[in-house]
Amino acid sequence: MSLRNWLDKLRPQFEEGGKWHAFKSIYDGMDTFLYVPNETSKSGTSIHDAIDSKRIMSIVVISLIPAMLFGMYNIGYQNALAAGKLGEATCMGMFLYGALMLLPKILVSYIVGLGIEFAWAQWKGEEIQEGYLVSGILIPLIVPITLPLWMLALAVAFAVIFTKEIFGGTGMNTFNVALAARAFLFFSYPGSMTGDKIWAATNQICGLGYTLPDGFTMATPLGEVAQGASVNASVCDMVLGLIPGSVGETSVIAIAIGAIILIWTNIASWKTMFSVFVGGIVMALIFHSTGASPLQWYEHIVLGGFCFGAIFMATDPVTSARTEQGKWIYGFLIGAMAVIIRVLNPGYPEGMMLAILFGNMCAPLIDYCVVQSNINKRAKRAKM
């Protein structure tokens, strides 16, 4: 019996009157995740594309895989580097160590987030929404590898409930869910999100990795600059991603592969991506020319979460600007704000998280102004 036939055979048990009717939303969620919904328009003529929202989310997850895989390797690399054992560590050993450190966080993120979504759908008698497929993998990639699992679970619960569900679910949230989780952690547990003691895994797992001494410290390049020191990492290491940082944000090459996938499949707006980089470069040039920032413009781009945020966060179709002109303004605003926060607020050397959340808040206003401007222009032409 095929999986399709097996699901069809089970369907009557979940329909009204069936003994498992209370779990119909769970059945529908699994069915539509595995197969394209077989829907017929009740009025008018429509052509249904095979790409629905779940397939779009799946493509975004696929685009994140290069950054995730390199992040796993970098976890092991930073651990071996900190232990002074880089010469004897193997690439596969470092990758497996990183995978064993990261997978529990991904599992906790999905279990807590999807568990809340399932429970919420059951409570409201609605279909399970698919938006958390992307947020579930984004959240572990934008936090330090040393973050305790219970903190991650708490942040996921907060973000899903208070950023998404109470606003109506998928497609109705004002702020990016993954960034809301990170903001919750940043303001609630700053010691676990910033500083120089959180960027390298310090313990062995399943016989892999190295145990680091208590009190070991390792600063990110942006953290070094904030403390008045120069960046020790080479440009090559910055681009490859062999530097301390959150799991998925370090490798520009891996992020670029994800960007190509998103642009090629027309899932994310290249205008938003490009304008974020333009805004960041313009502000970086201004600050560097005035002596306010020691970093070159390209260092601002390749360090921290700038590239990751520009590709995967700023382009969120729900929370970003939707008008074509608005995308340029929205992206430029985020890029410029990220560099401004980095330079003018030494206590928070990253900047990208707050810049994107600020952009999310401004996106509806940007779209409104663009639409009103077009309406006013057409009204003037009509009077001529």
Language-model segment annotations:
Residues 112-117, 132-141, 156-163, 254-261, ...:
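Hydrophobic, membrane-inserted alpha-helices
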Residues 1-106:
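N-terminal signal-anchor module of multipass membrane proteins
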Residues 41-47, 113-124, 161-171, 257-265, ...:
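C-terminal ends of transmembrane helices
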Residues 127-208:
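Membrane-interface helix-loop-helix junctions at boundaries between adjacent transmembrane segments
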Residues 171-256:
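Long hydrophobic alpha-helical segments that form multi-pass transmembrane helix bundles
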Residues 273-324:
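A beta-strand-loop signature enriched in Asp, Gly, Thr, and Trp
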Residues 95-109, 146-155, 238-252, 294-306:
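Structural signature of hydrophobic alpha-helical transmembrane segments
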Residues 153, 174-179, 297-305, 327-329, ...:
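Loop-to-transmembrane alpha-helix initiation sites
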